[in-house]
Amino acid sequence: YLVSPAAYAALGAYMFLLILVGFPVNFLTLYVTLEHKKLRTPLNYILLNLAVADLFMVLGGFTTTMYTSMHGYFVLGRLGCNLEGFFATLGGEIALWSLVVLAIERWIVVRKPISNFRFTEDHAIMGLGFSWVMASTCAVPPLVGWLRYIPEGMQCSCGVDYYTRAEGFNTESFVLYMFTVHFLIPLSVIFFCYGRLLCAVKEAAAAQQESETTQRAEKEVSRMVVIMVIGYLVCWLPYASVAWWIFCNQGSEFGPIFMTLPAFFAKTSAIYNPLIYICMNKQFRHCMI
């Protein structure tokens, strides 16, 4: 044991709680949306994509971590580590790029930079494909030799190896690629879209260009997506910050808890998206009841 057995027991209990909550709420989101035709809108396709991403994390990552925490180390070998790291990375990245697509959709629908543009089912499907392709370009490289997945923190889950700088894995280039393409760029797009969106909402309200009902509906949807983005940042920014600090301070000593806490706090992202969707979408709640 790297830390006390009680810490592994607490970790296992925490993962069990995430599975107990994360699987039902994400499955419920998928089931209710697919069951009720009026919920099958282009925007909701992207929200369904978030639920699928969260289920990847729950089924492919959380169950594995709960099992390994009972043993005090990662007992599933190289293949198990690759699979767990892949599913966790893929799920987190699909969620991030889905939020990018949602931000662009909100900007186009509210800001109207393209006249007479409607966000249709085809656009939503393109957005889904885009999110999966971009997520794969982050999750697949460690499987084929550009960096690798290794047990991290308390050695109960696997993530990308950004701290050993082992020879032959081009650690520096992948970490710079990951932080630039899969963190800074998507967040910059999100902040740009919502910055422009806030300006558009204020201008429309001042000019009374649209009916009050339409404005209220667009504001509610935009507020829901903004809260999802804030939730993503709250969950993943500590992990990204610690990972970057470790990468930039090679040789510095840090304990297993230092890396474990932000990594497992980030996993709560599999719960908050469906809860936000359920709590802030009246139409969904009515269909669910």
From Swiss-Prot:
PANTHER family: OPSIN (PTHR24240)
SUPFAM superfamilies to which the protein is assigned, alphabetical: Family A G protein-coupled receptor-like
Motif 'Ionic lock' involved in activated form stabilization per record, residues: 105-107
Gene: rho
Membrane topology of the entry: Multi-pass membrane protein
Recorded family membership: Belongs to the G-protein coupled receptor 1 family. Opsin subfamily.
Positions on the Extracellular side per record topology: 1-7, 68-81, 145-173, 246-257
Subcellular location: Membrane; Cell projection, Cilium, Photoreceptor outer segment
A Gene Ontology cellular-component term: photoreceptor disc membrane
Segments on the Cytoplasmic face: 33-44, 105-123, 196-223, 280-289
Post-translational events: Phosphorylated on some or all of the serine and threonine residues present in the C-terminal region.
Claim: Thylakoid is one of the keywords in the record: no
GO MF assignments: 11-cis retinal binding; G protein-coupled photoreceptor activity
Residues spanning the membrane: 8-32, 45-67, 82-104, 124-144, 174-195, 224-245, 258-279
Name of the protein described by the UniProt record: Rhodopsin
Major location (coarse): membrane
In-chain residues carrying the UniProt-annotated modification N6-(retinylidene)lysine: 267
GO biological process, one term: G protein-coupled opsin signaling pathway
Record keywords: Cell projection, Chromophore, Disulfide bond, G-protein coupled receptor, Lipoprotein, Membrane, Palmitate, Phosphoprotein, Photoreceptor protein, Receptor, Retinal protein, Sensory transduction, Transducer, Transmembrane, Transmembrane helix, Vision
Pfam families associated with the record: 7tm_1 (PF00001)
Function in brief: Photoreceptor required for image-forming vision at low light intensity. While most salt water fish species use retinal as chromophore, most freshwater fish use 3-dehydroretinal, or a mixture of retinal and 3-dehydroretinal. Light-induced isomerization of 11-cis to all-trans retinal triggers a conformational change that activates signaling via G-proteins. Subsequent receptor phosphorylation mediates displacement of the bound G-protein alpha subunit by arrestin and terminates signaling.
Disulfide-bond pairs as recorded: 81-158
Site (Plays an important role in the conformation switch to the active conformation): 84
